[in-house]
From Swiss-Prot:
It comes from Paracoccidioides lutzii (strain ATCC MYA-826 / Pb01). Disulfide bonds: none annotated. Belongs to the ATP25 family. The lineage of its organism: Eukaryota, Fungi, Dikarya, Ascomycota, Pezizomycotina. This is ATPase synthesis protein 25, mitochondrial. It is found in: Mitochondrion inner membrane. InterPro entries: Atp25, NT_sf.
Amino acid sequence: MSRILLRGIQCHACRQNVIRSFVSASGVTITPPAIGSVSTFNPHLSGSFPTRRVELFSSKAKDDSSLAADSVSENSAAQEDSYPQENSQQHVPWYLQEELQEMAPHPMRQQQELPPLPENPPPILKVLLEYISADIGLDNLNLLDLRALDPPPALGANLIMIFGTARGVKHLNVSADRFCRWLRTTYKLRPDADGLLGRNELKIKLRRKARRAKLAKRAGSTLTQPDDGITTGWICVDVGIVEGGQLSKPEGVQKAGFVGFGTVVQGTRIVVQMMTEEKREEIDLESLWRQTLEENSMENQDLPKPQAEEPPQVVGFTHEPSTITTADFSHRISQTPPIRANYEQLRSISTSLHRLRDNRGPATDFVPTGTAAATKSAESNSSQVSLPSLFNYLSNLEPDKAIDELGQGVDDRTSTGFLQKFYEELARAAPQIASTQRLELMCTAILLQHSGYRKDNLFQAFKEHIVSNYPLPRALVLRLLDALLAFKADPNSNPPRLRLPSADMELALQLIENAALRGANIFHADFLIRVFLAVSYRTRVYAVKPENLHSAAITGNRIPVSIDEFESVQRIQTRLASIIRAAKVALGEKEYLDILRVHSNQGEYAKFWNAWGEVSLQGIHRGKSFYLFLFDLHAELGDWQQSRTTLLNCIPMMWREDPPIFFDAELAEAVSKCIALAYPDIDDRVQQNLPALIVKTWHRCRIAIQNQKMSERKERLIQAELGTLPEN
C-alpha cells in the first residue's frame, strides 16, 4: 500500500511529509536528505518513479519511541531554521529572476513640477500650487517673488505672482472658474478674475459664434471679426491678501526724500496668471517682471551714504568752494537732500536762500550758512536761477552771434565770456543739475548747427547721464530727440542730402529705447510724429528708376530720387501710421499739419486728402491755420491743376465749417495767390463778371485786403494825431 501511495504522490516534498508522518508514529528515525543535493529544477514527470532505491531508513533503530519522536522534532525544527538561510543562498536561474526595470520619467512630469517656495512663504502658497498643478492641471508653473519691489507695483505690495499654462481656451476658462470657486468655498476668499467668462456666458458666446459661422458658410463668406471676446487666452486671478509671508524690513530704513502716507499692508497678495501657451509666448510676461525686479534691485542696492554732518558753528561765517567730482555718489541717492537729524540746519538753509536771492554776488562772496552741506545746497539753488538766465540770454541773440558765444566746440570752456560764466555756475551746481544743463547746452548748439558740437558728443554725454542714474524727465528726452533728429536738406550737394543720415537715426532710436526703459510712454504723438518726420524727405521729391536717376531733371520744384529708396520710406511711414492707429495715439493740430506737409512733399495726394478728412473725424476744428497752410502750400507748389482742385473743393468747405471760416487779409492774400496760379486769366473773368465761384471769391479777397489796408491807415492817422496832443 505504501508503494501505491508513493506512486500517487509525485512531489518529493509531499512524499517526505507523508513518510515522516507514518514513521514518527512507529519510532523509526528518518535521515533528512541534504538540501544541496536536491535538484532545483523539476524532473520529467512520468507515471512511475525510477527503480533506483533510496535509502530512507537508518540501520540503527531505537527502541525508545519517545527519544525518536524528540529527535524527529529537533531535526524538523533545525531543518525549518536552516531553510530560509539556505533558500536565500541557493541559485536562481535567469528565467525565474525578477527584473527590476528602471521606470523612465514621464515626459509630462517635468511640466508638472512645482516651483520652489520663496523665503518666508505664506502658509496657503504650497496648497495653492498643489491645487493648481494637480486638480486644475496647469502646466509649466512658475513663481515670481515680487515682495522686494520698492515702490510696490500697481497690483499691490508684498506681491507673489504665479504663472501657469492651460491646454486651451476652454481649459483656461474652466480652470479659472474652478479655482475661484475653490478659493471661495475653502478659504472664504473673494478672488477677482479679470478676463474670465462665466459658465453660462461662455456657452452662450460659443453657441452664437457657431451660429454666425454657420450662417456665413451658407452665404459663402467667412467671419472676419478679429476679436470675438472668447479667445483672449489670458485670465488674471487676483487671489487677494492672505495671511503671513510679508517681508520684514528693518525699522528706519527709508529712502531719502521719501514722502508718503497710509498704513503698511499686512499679509501677502497672490496673483495667478493663467494663459494659453501661445499667449504666454507672445507677451512673455515673466521676462518683463524679471527685468523690472532686476532694475529695482539695482536701484535699491546699498550705495555709499553721506556721513553725518557736524553741528553748525555759532561764530563766524565761512565759505568753501565746491569740489564735486563725477565719482561723488553721495548726491545720487535722491533728487532731494537727505533729511537731517538737526532741524536747526533746515532753518539756516532757508535763511541763506533768502539772503542769496536778495544779495547775489560773485562766487567768492560769503554766504551765511551753518554747514558745508547747507552751503552746497544754497549754491545749487543759486545755479538753478543763473543757468536759465544764461540760456535766456543765448536764445535772444541772433543765430550767428549765438554760435560765436558757444566757442570752438565741446572742449572749449574759456574762449568767450558766456562759456566762462556758464562753466563757473556749472561747477557750483549739484552733479545732477550740472549734467542736465550740459546736455541742454549741447542741444542748443546742435540746433543752431554749430560745427564744433557733434551728435555723437551729445549721445556720449547722454550715456554718462544714464550711467550716473540721474533722472530723465520727459522734457529733456524730447529736447535730446530734437537735437539728434535735427537736419537741414541740401539739394545742391552731390549727391543731394534730402533725408536724415542713418547714423543719426540709430542714435535717436537708442535714445527712445533708453527712455522706454525709464518708463516713458513712447506710444505718444511727441515721439511717433518726430520719428515719422525723421524718416521722411525734407523737400519735394518724385521717384524715378535707378538707371534714370542721373539723367532726371528737377521738375516743378521736385527733386528726383531713386524709386527703391522712395518705396522704402513709404513702407516705414506705413508701419508708423499703423502703430499710431493701433495705439490710438491722439494727434493735434501741429501733428496733422506736419503729416500733410510730408505727403505733399512726396506727391502722395490721395494720402494727403485722407489725412485732411481724418482731422475733422478726430473732432479737431479745421480753423484758419489749416486753410492758410493749405493755400500757401499749393501756391508754393506751383501746380495749377492741384491748385484748381483745391480751390473748387475747399472754398465751399470753409463756409461749412463750424464755426465757418471767413476771409481776413492774411487768408485772402494766400487764396489770391492760389487763384492767380490756377486761373491766369482771372482779370478777364472779373471784367466779364462771370457768375462763377472763383470770380466771387476773388472779389471777396480784394475786399478783405482793402479793408485791412484802410484799417491800418486809420490806425496810423490816430497814432499821428495822438502824437501831436499835448502831454497832461
